Amino acid sequence: MLNLKIRSARIEDAAILAAAERTIAETPGLLVSRPSELILESFEEKIVELSKIGRYVVAQKDGKIVGHALLDPMRLAAISHVFRLTIMVHPGFQSQGVGEALMRNLMDWATRTPQVGKIELLVRATNERAMRLYTKLGFVVEGRFRKRLRLPDGEFVDDIAMAWFPDR
């Protein structure tokens, strides 16, 4: 993707990030959160928090935010080397290299950051495109959470647990 820039998220990005996630959440099964559960203050707090203890980045194309991703460390000492990855490619920008660029940025940061020993993520079993990308980038399947997400129509979707270990 041409003109793609990855940068650290800023507090003034929070409204755009929240709005994008609300739009994505309108499609059942894409996110765990429902649109009404995605509030601006939570995004602002997460941006501030991860600027100190993790990483929160946005992808911009021609100045417009088109995706975002974060690495959030686990809080308990015994698993503090494990960082949870969350990634969103905003509507209309899938299959254009945004997700891969965000992932590579986070993985590069993780490789340079000694505190990161493992990155974990969950992906819907129905999201084959994302699973192919994660596998291409070196993530491995660690397990399956059956019937983890209940859709509004009562159906269930499995989540696949994947992980990546930085080379040092």
What name fits each language-model region?
Residues I11, L30-G92, M103-R104, W109, ...:
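Acetyl-CoA-dependent GNAT
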Residues L17, A59, V89, L102, ...:
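Hydrophobic packing within well-folded, soluble alpha/beta domains
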Residues A19-P35:
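Helix-loop element at the rim of GNAT/NAT acetyltransferase active sites that forms part
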Residues F83, G117, R124-E128, K147-R168:
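C-terminal "cap" of GNAT-fold acetyltransferases
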Residues Q96, E100-A101, R112, A125-G143:
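Conserved active-site alpha-helix within GNAT-family acetyltransferase domains
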